[in-house]
């Protein structure tokens, strides 16, 4: 059983006709939170008391033309006339992949590629000696055999945790409810800046209901949320995982392979800003001057931030003394949200090794440098937006 703490994720498993984005395949549905049209992003299920779905004539009669494509009405929890109650819930769990694709290794790929060329009447591209070296595993840095689904790059599982505190109470004159929710989710990657990928979120919702006298009641609702999502620059890891040939490139090569007498090679790596763990340099080729591994290690990161504030208040007046069943309702609401992305965008150099063999030992006798290491230290801001909605009825 899945447990989520935002939006209406997986609600389609409980409500017929709801597909996660619309009602019965119809977009632009009207969403009401406590009677106010609102964006439901990041609303926590622990805040929700009831969800009602409407479609068709009854929706239009009640809410006008905006409801022609369906209505989702969310009612949040409220306080009751009880003693102070505090409820704290903590959840933690792990995302575990059921399976990962199992692609061919370099030797198998090269063998089948030669067969494909032979079927087209072409000569072999890879020699038997090359295939032997790539298949032997004797030097995976010279004879690359990259598996991007390997535990060298991604975790078997990653964590997601959240904690929620609900506080409520009151008497016949006033009662209140408060919900405080914090969540943190990590990511599957374990290399470079990507190992710091993750999401943090804080939601705080509160409301107060007042009974001023026998015929006048009032209420106040407020909600604030803060979300941030950090991610390494370079977003094409999974597409590369399914298309990058296993023999194309070794992303990291140990410095220990560089010949002690290769002075020019040592000068190049000595001036590099991106020696990984003090013992690996970023490898590249003329065709792959940058790659997804280099991006994750050296191109920086971005952080997306979302903030929102929601407030509404209303008064209900019973006018039974004037006419039985007559009442007056008024409400005012204001919603404000901002979003922006900050990032550090770096460029980096990669190095193509020139391999040789000395006494049966593979060594690097030279390096060819592509691109330059550049870290400006400038924080870039992009994707900024803000939205304000005011309602009075």
Which residues does each PLM region occupy?
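Membrane-proximal, glycine/serine-rich, low-complexity loop/turn segments characteristic
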Residues: 1-30, 36-41, 46, 58-311, ...
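Small-side-chain secondary-structure face that scaffolds active or pore-lining regions
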Residues: 183, 188-201, 223, 231-233, ...
């Amino acid at each position: 059983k899945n447990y989520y703490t935002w939006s209406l994720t997986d609600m389609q498993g409980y409500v017929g006709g709801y597909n996660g984005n619309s009602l019965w395949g119809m977009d632009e549905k009207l969403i009401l939170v406590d009677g106010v049209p609102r964006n439901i992003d990041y609303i926590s299920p622990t805040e929700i008391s009831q969800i009602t779905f409407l479609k068709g004539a009854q929706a239009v009669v009640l809410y006008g033309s905006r409801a022609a494509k369906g209505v989702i009405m969310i009612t949040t929890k409220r306080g009751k006339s009880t003693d102070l109650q505090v409820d704290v819930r903590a959840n933690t769990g792990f995302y575990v992949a059921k399976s990962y694709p199992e692609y061919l290794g370099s030797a198998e790929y090269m063998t089948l590629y030669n067969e494909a060329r032979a079927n087209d009447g072409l000569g072999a591209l890879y020699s038997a000696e090359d295939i032997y070296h790539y298949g032997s595993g004797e030097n995976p840095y010279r004879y690359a055999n990259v598996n991007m689904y390997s535990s060298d790059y991604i975790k078997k599982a990653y964590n997601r945790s959240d904690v929620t505190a609900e506080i409520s109470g009151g008497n016949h004159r006033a009662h209140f409810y408060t919900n405080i929710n914090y969540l943190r989710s990590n990511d599957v990657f374990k290399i470079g800046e990507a190992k710091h990928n993750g999401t943090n979120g804080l939601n705080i919702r509160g409301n107060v209901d007042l009974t001023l006298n026998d015929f006048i009641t009032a209420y106040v609702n407020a909600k604030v949320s803060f979300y941030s999502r950090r991610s390494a620059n370079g977003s094409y890891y999974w597409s590369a995982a399914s298309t990058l040939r296993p023999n194309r490139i070794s992303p990291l090569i140990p410095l220990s392979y560089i010949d002690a007498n290769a002075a020019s090679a040592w000068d190049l790596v000595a001036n590099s800003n991106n020696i990984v763990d003090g013992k690996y340099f970023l490898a590249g080729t003329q065709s792959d001057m940058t790659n997804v591994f280099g991006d994750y290690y050296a191109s920086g990161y971005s952080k997306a931030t979302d903030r929102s504030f929601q407030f509404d208040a209303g008064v209900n007046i019973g006018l039974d003394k004037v006419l039985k069943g007559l009442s007056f309702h008024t409400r005012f609401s204001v919603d404000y949200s901002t979003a922006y992305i900050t990032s550090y965008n770096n460029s980096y150099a990669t190095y193509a090794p020139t391999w040789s063999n000395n006494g049966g030992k593979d060594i690097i006798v030279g390096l060819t440098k592509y691109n330059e290491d550049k870290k400006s230290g400038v924080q870039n801001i992009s994707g900024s937006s803000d939205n304000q909605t005011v309602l009075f009825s």
